């Protein structure tokens, strides 16, 4: 009986997370950016690759259709990777949609975050504005990819970072350019284990600012499995300020390897990450991400779009 009890408890723990919401149609994605159009509520899903893939649907569950690319000719930023853009992040301000993207190559710190704008989110409607001025070189303590925008009052900030010294933030002059003289400051750092953090996404709820980020090995699962727990997963910290002071549920600083687990591998879901938060028209907060569905395949080309409505307890989110 004791052995059966242990097995039951193990299985219960392994299935502590809700499965992703339903998805039909073109459900592939990688480092997704999701937005709901203001005019009609239609959903647009953007993904890493080429000039940033665009899919759309009338419902989160789909069916999702492939609509083309944001920048089919690539970015005007003259760096390796200008035709293979990463990590779209979107917001809407004063009648315009802004999309941040990253230009880089795997393992390189020669990186830049660019921005494009549209009034409709549709393919063919986007204007590339090139670099925001948020750039890095091998001499930088950070890597300027995975940009994420947030506004606090009349100030705008861009969160960014991947590996190296992890996650940083810098103030923007507007939605297009970094503020003159602004210096990036560190938001989060993991000194433990394999150390990797990236894909910052910050949002506000009930007087708290929440910093979500992805940790662990992001890809290559078709070649080799990382050690258990070292695959991609999603963590969260919170603060009463958008510019720092983030701690996890145990009060451990995000600058000192803190971070409470929000979503990890479970069931057929492996390596969830590249996440963001969507506030839909019903004011519900939805966590979205990519994951490897072990029933389909482990390669990047097999990644799937995942989403879950967040649950809340004591102002901490769960899935």
From Swiss-Prot:
It comes from Aspergillus clavatus (strain ATCC 1007 / CBS 513.65 / DSM 816 / NCTC 3887 / NRRL 1 / QM 1276 / 107). The lineage of its organism: Eukaryota, Fungi, Dikarya, Ascomycota, Pezizomycotina. SUPFAM superfamilies: Arabinanase/levansucrase/invertase. It catalyses: Endohydrolysis of (1->5)-alpha-arabinofuranosidic linkages in (1->5)-arabinans. Glycans are attached at residues 190, 222. Keywords: Carbohydrate metabolism, Glycoprotein, Glycosidase, Hydrolase, Polysaccharide degradation, Secreted, Signal, Xylan degradation. One of its GO terms (biological process) is xylan catabolic process. It is found in: Secreted. InterPro entries: GH43_arabinanases, Glyco_hydro_43, Glyco_hydro_43_endo_a_Ara-ase, Glyco_hydro_beta-prop_sf. Pathway: Glycan metabolism; L-arabinan degradation. Belongs to the glycosyl hydrolase 43 family. The active site is at residues 31, 198. Its EC number is 3.2.1.99. The record marks 146 as: Important for catalytic activity, responsible for pKa modulation of the active site Glu and correct orientation of both the proton donor and substrate. This is Probable arabinan endo-1,5-alpha-L-arabinosidase C. One of its GO terms (molecular function) is arabinan endo-1,5-alpha-L-arabinosidase activity. One of its GO terms (cellular component) is extracellular region. Endo-1,5-alpha-L-arabinanase involved in degradation of pectin. Its preferred substrate is linear 1,5-alpha-L-arabinan. Residues 1-16 form the signal peptide.
């Amino acid at each position: 009986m004791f052995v059966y009890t242990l097995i039951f408890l193990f299985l219960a723990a392994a299935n502590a997370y809700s499965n992703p919401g339903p998805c039909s149609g073109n459900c592939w994605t990688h480092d997704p950016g999701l937005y709901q159009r203001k005019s009609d509520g239609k959903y647009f899903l953007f993904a890493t690759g080429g000039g940033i893939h665009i899919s759309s649907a009338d419902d989160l569950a789909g069916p999702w259709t492939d609509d083309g690319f944001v920048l089919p000719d690539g970015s005007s930023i003259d760096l390796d990777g200008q035709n293979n853009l990463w990590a779209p992040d979107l917001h809407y301000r004063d009648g315009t949609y802004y999309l941040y993207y990253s230009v880089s190559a795997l393992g390189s710190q020669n990186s830049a975050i660019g921005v494009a704008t549209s009034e409709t989110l549709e393919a063919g409607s986007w204007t590339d504005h090139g670099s925001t001025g948020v750039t890095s070189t091998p001499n930088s303590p950070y890597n300027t990819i995975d940009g994420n925008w947030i506004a606090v009052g009349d100030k705008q900030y861009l969160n960014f970072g991947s590996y190296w010294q992890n996650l940083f933030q810098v103030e923007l002059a507007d939605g297009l350019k970094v503020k003159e003289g602004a210096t990036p400051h560190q938001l989060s750092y993991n000194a433990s284990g394999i150390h990797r953090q990236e894909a910052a996404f910050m949002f506000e709820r009930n007087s708290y600012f929440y910093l979500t980020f992805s940790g662990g090995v992001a890809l290559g699962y078709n070649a080799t499995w990382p050690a258990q727990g070292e695959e991609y997963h999603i963590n969260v910290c919170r603060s009463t300020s958008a510019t720092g002071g983030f701690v996890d549920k145990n009060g451990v600083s995000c600058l000192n390897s803190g971070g409470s687990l929000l979503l990890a591998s479970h069931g057929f879901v492996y390596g969830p990450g590249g996440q963001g938060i969507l506030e839909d028209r019903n004011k519900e907060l939805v966590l979205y991400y990519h994951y490897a569905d072990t029933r389909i395949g482990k390669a990047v080309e097999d990644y799937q779009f995942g989403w879950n409505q967040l649950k809340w307890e004591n102002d901490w989110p769960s899935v």
